[in-house]
């Protein structure tokens, strides 16, 4: 196996005052199944793009590998899927296509359908298979789970576990645990490489933080004690100096004064050393402040009621018949495979032009806050976006700061935000809305793990009435009080 090495890697986006990487150094083996983790905006996708040679940088980034990036664009998507695969990996023999796709749960007939007619999950699996069908390429896989249902994530995780050598960006904890054997984390103070899965890395990271917190507390007490001792020594020294006036044994007094001055210097040196050590601690601690939400109470006990509900796409039934009720304080997870009508049901609740039969009843005057999957509508200034929705600007920006966005980020065009940062904007705006019901469609796509944990804690503590779609199993199990299966 060969190595990928960075030595003094430095990179900034044009016009940005802060570098994404400054003198970064790391070394990784191309035989590793490497998980790349870090908060949104920390530079995960940027690092992949640097490896692809798309950006100019300072320092050295050395590798003999030829890299392939996922997701890759598909020109002429109206062509048959088999033709798309032939173009992406011309050296692969045709019989390998159905074999590889079967490992990902894709039927062979998908090869003879236009690529454009495949579901988002099927497209993801086809493009992933192409990565490993190409010879002599090292895969760089950026967020493959965003369009995959729970079963699809399990299949892709098992598929990647069979492979050898790739870099994977993902924020799904269980998905990472299932398929990686090393972690490269982009921390606040630099880059760390560690063997093991994500949970192993997180346990070690937390252990190190606890150790540093304990050391920080001991040093804080030491500094306080040394300052008090220095103050006493200074007071004693002043008194001794004063006693020299008219003292009979001036040699004795001078010797005593010199000893105290020496002790004072020693205390000052120890204090400075303790402060230096203290300054080197906790540089990687992520400050994840608690979020707050105050949902509105509704006079009706039941917020949503469906009876024999069926959703139709033309003459095809997408889902149903479906019967359920959602009471105040319940957080219901909509569960079903890709294409089962989950997003359509949410849009129907919002009054969208969705054809349905059966009964759907919402409580009178029900106010709904919605987080869509798609972030493409976010453009222009953040302040203008907040004001356009009639929201409290200060509160919304305070939430975004808690979710890890810097104040400098607020001045940038929303179109230049990373996908994870855009999702944080949508979630922050939803949390600022006064609503009886929160409807969130795959809110965690592209969202970093720290933000996921913050949102988990918020929803468990504030207990809003909620209907959501989310394929992150750990999040769903932590948040949902009931599951509605389509």
Region spans (language model):
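Coiled-coil termination/hinge junctions
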Residues: 279-304
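ABC ATP-binding cassette signature C-motif
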Residues: 1-212, 298-486
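Short, highly charged low-complexity linear segments
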Residues: 61-63, 233-243, 264-265, 282-291, ...
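Intrinsically disordered, low-complexity boundary segments flanking structured domains
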Residues: 56, 134, 274-278, 293
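Extended, highly charged alpha-helical segments
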Residues: 76-79, 83-100, 178, 185-287
């Amino acid at each position: 196996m060969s190595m990928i090495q960075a030595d003094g890697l430095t990179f900034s986006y044009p016009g940005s005052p802060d570098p994404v990487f400054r003198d970064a150094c790391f070394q990784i083996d191309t035989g590793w199944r490497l998980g790349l983790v870090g908060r949104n905006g920390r530079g995960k996708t940027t690092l992949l793009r640097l490896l692809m040679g798309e950006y100019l940088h300072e320092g050295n980034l050395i590798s003999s590998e030829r890299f392939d990036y996922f997701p890759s664009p598909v020109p002429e998507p109206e062509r048959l899927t088999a033709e798309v695969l032939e173009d992406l990996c011309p050296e692969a023999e045709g019989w390998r296509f159905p074999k590889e796709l079967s490992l990902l749960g894709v039927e062979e007939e998908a090869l003879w359908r236009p690529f454009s007619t495949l579901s988002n999950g099927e497209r993801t699996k086809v493009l992933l298979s192409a990565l490993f069908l190409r010879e002599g390429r090292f895969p760089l896989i950026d967020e493959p789970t965003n369009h995959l249902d729970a079963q699809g994530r399990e299949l892709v995780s098992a598929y990647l576990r069979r492979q050898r050598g790739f870099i994977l960006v993902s924020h799904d904890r269980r998905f990472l645990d299932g398929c990686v054997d090393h972690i490269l984390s982009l921390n606040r103070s630099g880059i760390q490489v560690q063997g093991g899965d994500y949970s192993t890395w997180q346990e070690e990271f937390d252990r190190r933080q606890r150790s540093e917190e304990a050391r920080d507390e001991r040093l804080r007490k030491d500094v306080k004690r040394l300052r008090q001792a220095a103050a006493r020594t200074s007071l004693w020294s002043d008194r001794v100096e004063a006693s020299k006036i008219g003292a009979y044994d001036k040699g004795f007094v001078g010797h005593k004064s010199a000893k105290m001055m020496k002790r004072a210097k020693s205390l000052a040196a120890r204090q400075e050393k303790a402060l230096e050590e203290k300054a080197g601690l906790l540089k990687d601690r992520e400050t994840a402040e608690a979020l707050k939400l105050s949902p509105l109470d509704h006079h009706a006990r039941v917020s949503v009621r469906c009876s024999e509900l069926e959703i139709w796409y033309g003459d095809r039934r997408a889902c149903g018949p479906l019967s359920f009720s959602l009471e105040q304080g319940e957080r219901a997870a909509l569960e079903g495979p890709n294409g089962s009508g989950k997003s359509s049901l949410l849009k129907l609740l919002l009054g969208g032009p969705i054809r349905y039969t059966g009964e759907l009843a919402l409580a009178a005057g029900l106010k709904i806050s919605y987080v869509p999957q798609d972030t493409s509508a976010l453009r222009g200034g953040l302040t203008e976006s907040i004001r356009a929705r009639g929201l409290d600007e200060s509160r919304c920006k305070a939430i975004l700061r808690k979710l890890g966005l810097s104040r400098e980020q607020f001045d940038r065009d929303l179109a230049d935000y990373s996908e994870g940062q855009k999702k944080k904007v949508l979630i922050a705006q939803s949390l600022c809305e006064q609503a009886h019901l929160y409807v969130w469609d795959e809110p965690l796509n592209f969202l970093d793990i720290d933000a996921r944990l913050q949102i988990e804690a918020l929803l468990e503590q504030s207990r809003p009435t909620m209907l959501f779609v989310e394929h992150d199993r750990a999040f769903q199990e932590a948040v949902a009080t009931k599951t509605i299966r389509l």
